[in-house]
Every structure is written in C-alpha cells, then in structure tokens.
Swiss-Prot record:
Record-linked Gene3D superfamilies: Knottin, scorpion toxin-like
GO molecular function, one term: toxin activity
Subcellular location: Secreted
Name under which the protein is recorded: Potassium channel gamma toxin gamma-KTx 1.9
Source species: Centruroides tecomanus
Length: 42
C-alpha cells in the first residue's frame, strides 16, 4: 500500500526522515518524503 509507512515512520520537523526513507525503500518504493510530519512514499 502506497501509504503504509505513514504510521510506522516518524518525520521530524527539521529534515531528518531516515526512518521514512528506510520504510519506503523496504516497501519497494524509490524514496520517502515527509509532508506535515507524515511519511509519504514515492
């Protein structure tokens, strides 16, 4: 699911989103980005 990382991966205020990236890559996406403190996979 495209948004399966939203709840699992925290996004901090100032650009550190390694957990989001890792979650998205494991899920087979190219990258993860944070929007409004939520992880989105792309």
């Amino acid at each position: 699911d495209r948004d399966s990382c939203i709840d699992k991966s925290r996004c901090s205020k100032y650009g550190y989103y390694q957990e989001c990236q890792d979650c998205c890559k494991k899920a087979g996406h190219n990258r993860g980005t944070c929007m409004f403190f939520k992880c989105k996979c792309a």
